[in-house]
Amino acid sequence: RRQRQMCIRDRLMHDFGAKGLACTPSYALYLAETIHQSSIPLEEFQLRVGAFGAEPWTENMRKELETKLNIKAYDIYGLTEICGPGVGGECECQNGTHLWEDHFFPEIVDPNTLQPVEPGQVGELVFTTLTKEGMPMLRYRTRDLTSLTYEKCACGRTAVRMGRILGRSDDMLII
């Protein structure tokens, strides 16, 4: 039954001409494996782009996804607690996640002292929502460890960019 479901999903992506894929990077690697095992050659799929998040992933995983699915793979970031379609996403330069500063004020703090760290240093990501009504978040601790850069991106955007998630300050695992 599972093999049949995989074939149906792959067939639907093929038949509807899906050009984009949004999921976790680990699920995208699983999809790549099933597509390569299917009777439909990868060249017949129209996939061109993937937006991946909800779990940490590496540059090696990005390269593997881009090679195995013949797509451009972009990192996205969001939090259930913050709501909305996310907090930021990578641009075509793939050099950090642009955070939407018109809606969120990001900070990096030392997880032990909660004091701000210098730009570029790794610490815990903290958000204050600027436009969320009803339940605004003030200095919400994400427990995600990363860094921020305020340098202008090669794409021309000036929004702060977040580096990859490097770990958690609370060592929490979701199983």
Report each predicted region and the residues it spans.
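Short, small-residue-biased leader/transition segments that mark boundaries at the very start
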Residues: 1-8
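Active-site glycine/GP-rich loop and adjacent strand/helix microenvironment
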Residues: 9-175
